[in-house]
Amino acid sequence: MIAIDTNVLLRYLLTDDKVQAARAAKLINGSKTVLVTDIALVETIWTLKGKKYGMSKAEIIQVILSLFAEPNIVFEDSQTVWQALYDYRQAKPVTVAGKRKEADFPDALLVNKAKYGAAINGEVIEAVYSFDRAAGMLPGVTEP
């Protein structure tokens, strides 16, 4: 198994640097299992949603689905990432200070990692507390 960082994953997804994209593809399409850590996934999504790339929610969903379709790519906990993707898709927008806002995929992953962390410790998460009103639309999130 190998792991890749955010930059390798971005070059693979965007193919915006031909040399680095080819090297990234060689790793990802090689003979080894490729771990995409939660941190690399979250940083990738933040970058893709940011000013430079400006990807929409629908595009982010497609990117994550495409990673699940890659035969060599695995996540730290695929079930948690999958549930986070589901919650992200289902989250309703809220209006904050007159602007429409939606929970981000990293918010959904944080909530689901909290649930997973509690479960592996024999607990059930009572709530994930956040001041982010959009994140508050995710199952299990409440304001303190």
Predicted segments, located by residue:
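Short, well-structured N-terminal submotif of metal-dependent ribonuclease cores
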Residues: 1-36, 52-62, 124
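Short, conserved active-site loops that position catalytic residues or coordinate cofactors/metal ions
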Residues: 38-46
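Amphipathic alpha-helical segments within well-ordered protein domains
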Residues: 45, 49, 65-68, 85
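Active-site catalytic pocket residues across diverse enzymes, especially alpha/beta-hydrolases
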Residues: 52, 117-121, 142
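Active-site neighborhoods of divalent-metal-dependent phosphate/nucleic-acid chemistry enzymes
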Residues: 72-129
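Short glycine-/acidic-enriched loop or helix-start segments at secondary-structure transitions
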Residues: 138-140
